[in-house]
């Protein structure tokens, strides 16, 4: 007996949607890494290991429970800071736009 073939496009569409979202997230993350390179963040920081400054994953862990973490990081990025991770100061980056500083802060907080 011949069974009618039921064609469904939902799994294919769902698969494409998931791939598209993953690609968008990866591109956004890559763009923020480029932004970090362009602004010399990676001269003192790395994602997973401590260099001169703390690893971004350690920053993300430290601020994970804080509701104002993004704003606090933006302030440190733009105005500099000292004493949060030892005695070595983090230089200010006042020429970095608030928007770009926020992108960097959000990217850093996802590093855990």
Label each residue range with its predicted role.
Residues 69, 73, 100-101:
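Stable alpha-helical elements in mature extracytoplasmic
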Residues 30-47:
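Sequence/structural segment immediately N-terminal to covalent heme-attachment motifs in c-type
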Residues 48, 67, 80-84, 111-112:
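A general structural signal marking secondary-structure boundaries and capping sites
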Residues 1-32, 112:
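N-terminal export/targeting leaders of redox proteins
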Residues 61-67:
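Conserved helix-turn-beta segment immediately C-terminal to the redox Cys motif
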Residues 43, 52-61, 78-105:
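Axial heme c-ligation environment in periplasmic c-type cytochrome domains
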